[in-house]
Amino acid sequence: MTGRAAQAAARRTAVALGLLVVLAGCSVNLPGTSTQGSGAVRTETRSVSGFSAIQLAGNGDVQIEQSGTESLTISAEENLLPLLTSDVVNNELRLGVKDGARIDTTQPITYKVTVRELTGMDVAGNGSQTATKVKTGSLRIRMAGTGSITATGTADAQDIQMAGSGTYRGSGLTSKTATVKSAGTGNAELAVSDSLDVNIIGNGTVTYTGSPQVNQSIIGSGSLQKK
């Protein structure tokens, strides 16, 4: 090996070792430890009120029904229940995990929510929300990550914003107008009668039914398809 080649090899080795040190440091400095689920599932009812939107951060499945009441039940492993949060902030029920806590589930986390009028659904992470019997003036959809949202019923207007590779299944929710902004590889399905505005950056797909007036802007390999 020539002197120049040896120096290059030494530099590569030094860089590799440096990366290992950085990675090792990152792994040592991760805050907290993960709490393993016990496997024993318990259902807990919590008192909630004054909300019309639901946000889920992390994993779990939220089942929402629009009715004349406001309620929340959580089914999860009993040792994880104290770590699950359910706070109402600015008219939004926020479901997640306590700050600094990390959980490792062996059984699904299921939230059942009833709400008087549903105006917003928000998923951050790989969780899911499903809403039935929706009847509202405007429904706001926010997605970040790989999660999914499904909605059925009626809404005068929909405002949908997606980032990541999530899926919005709104073909069972009829609406007059809809606005969709998608960045990433997400997929959205919806039913619109009057007007549809679509802005796609990336290779996401928006599929719609109905005969609305369509305005579209697509940057990348994304697509807008009429079903």
Language model regions located:
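Short acidic/polar N-terminal linker immediately downstream of export determinants
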Residues: 2-81, 92-114, 223-227
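Extended, compositionally simple hydrophobic/Ser/Thr-rich segments
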Residues: 44-45, 52-64, 103, 110-113, ...
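Conserved positions at the start
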Residues: 81-83, 146
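ATP/nucleoside-binding phosphotransfer catalytic cores, i.e., glycine-rich phosphate-binding loops
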Residues: 89
